Amino acid sequence: MKDVALGIDIGGTNTKFGFVDRDGHLYAETSVPTTKTPPDDIDAFLKYLYDEIELLKKEIAEELTIVGVGIGAPNGNYFTGTIEYAPNLSFRGVVPLVELFKKYYNVPMVLTNDANAAAIGEMIYGGAKGMRDFIMVTLGTGLGSGFVANGELVYGHDGFAGEMGHILQKPTGRTCGLGRRGCLESYVSATGIKRTVFKLLADMNDPTPLRDVTYNQLAAKQITELAHQGDPIAREAFDYTSRLLGQKLSDMVAIFSPEAIFLLGGLAKAGDELLFKPTKRYMEEYMFQVFRDKVKILPSALEDKNAAVLGASALAWKELGVNKHLREMPTPK
């Protein structure tokens, strides 16, 4: 029988989970659609998630004992165990996730922002090993971020520090999932780049297969594939996205002075040519000169190993008092 932590990453599109032992060995992982159950029915979702977790557990030859649970979720509050007003989830308002999920697993349980969980995973198991100051940016349905300063994850006074996706890009701009106007994630995310494409289709006359696709049919992956093939609309969309991301990262560098910035998520898979190099170029262009050529922009070293699941499980092991990799972190209230 093997003791494991259950690591869960709740995203706007998919929820990933896996079993991780105290040494960071990932026994098994899978993903399920976050939108499988009726919108705004958190009880139905958690029951569905529990059933899927138990199915995966039964597929493993070795008998596993879940001794702790770590969860990463948009707007997950480490101090309160609640998801609060997450723009890209159908669960609205304040959701007492830890309290509700303990009905299924009555073990030590901790919740944090999904990007914070990814940052912890990168710091312990990935490319940020040995780094004391770095930023993790997750580019999925929305834009998440986790900030590590002086070797510690920054939670802030109330647990919501590091919401880079909701800093203003344009005060009168696009509406985000929370109804705010001009948030960065409404431009720089899988959803944001789709909106950019449809704006460009109206402004440009270039022929493109994108004109034959409806908004609901279009996926960021298709935009990426067309951009690699030289499609002018898709390439312009990536350039615009990279410019906005580079601008805001230059601001973050001026505040935090990180050693590196890691990009993770579906949009980050666009690679060097479409995203990393142009983002770095724009960041340097807008950078306060004392920081120029000092900050690396890197892909997550855990892209294929699920940084958020590993990070969430690491937090669970920390709650159990056996994770020696993490420095002391504040105790949830």
Describe every region a protein language model picked out.
Residues 75, 89, 115, 173, ...:
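Short, flexible active-site-adjacent loop segments at beta-strand->alpha-helix junctions, enriched
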Residues 112-126:
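Conserved PLP phosphate-binding loop immediately N-terminal to the Schiff-base lysine helix
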Residues 14-16, 117-119, 142-144:
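Short glycine/serine/threonine-rich phosphate/pyrophosphate-binding segments
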Residues 30-32, 87, 157:
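Short hydrophobic alpha-helix segments
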Residues 87-91, 110-116, 136-139, 298-306:
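Active-site nucleophile and cofactor-binding loops and adjacent substrate-binding regions
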Residues 9, 70-74, 112, 136-142, ...:
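Short beta-strand segments
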Residues 129-188, 324:
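Glycine-rich phosphate-binding loop of actin/hexokinase-like ATP-binding domains
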Residues 1-68, 78-82, 99-107, 124-131, ...:
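ATP-binding/phosphotransfer module of carbohydrate and carboxylate kinases, centering on a glycine-rich
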